[in-house]
């Protein structure tokens, strides 16, 4: 997995990581994609 792949997959989670609250659906999908790539 490259840094670029990680960045693109977690980009949807940035607002959740910065502000908290509920993660966006894109964040959950991106994390699942990373787990599948690993």
Swiss-Prot record:
<comment type="function">
    <text>Possesses potent antifungal activity against F.graminearum but not P.infestans.</text>
</comment>
<keyword id="KW-0044">Antibiotic</keyword>
<keyword id="KW-0929">Antimicrobial</keyword>
<dbReference type="GO" id="GO:0006805">
    <property type="term" value="P:xenobiotic metabolic process"/>
</dbReference>
<dbReference type="GO" id="GO:0031640">
    <property type="term" value="P:killing of cells of another organism"/>
</dbReference>
<dbReference type="GO" id="GO:0050832">
    <property type="term" value="P:defense response to fungus"/>
</dbReference>
<comment type="similarity">
    <text>Belongs to the plant LTP family.</text>
</comment>
<protein>
    <recommendedName>
        <fullName>Antifungal protein 5</fullName>
    </recommendedName>
</protein>
<dbReference type="GO" id="GO:0042742">
    <property type="term" value="P:defense response to bacterium"/>
</dbReference>
<keyword id="KW-0295">Fungicide</keyword>
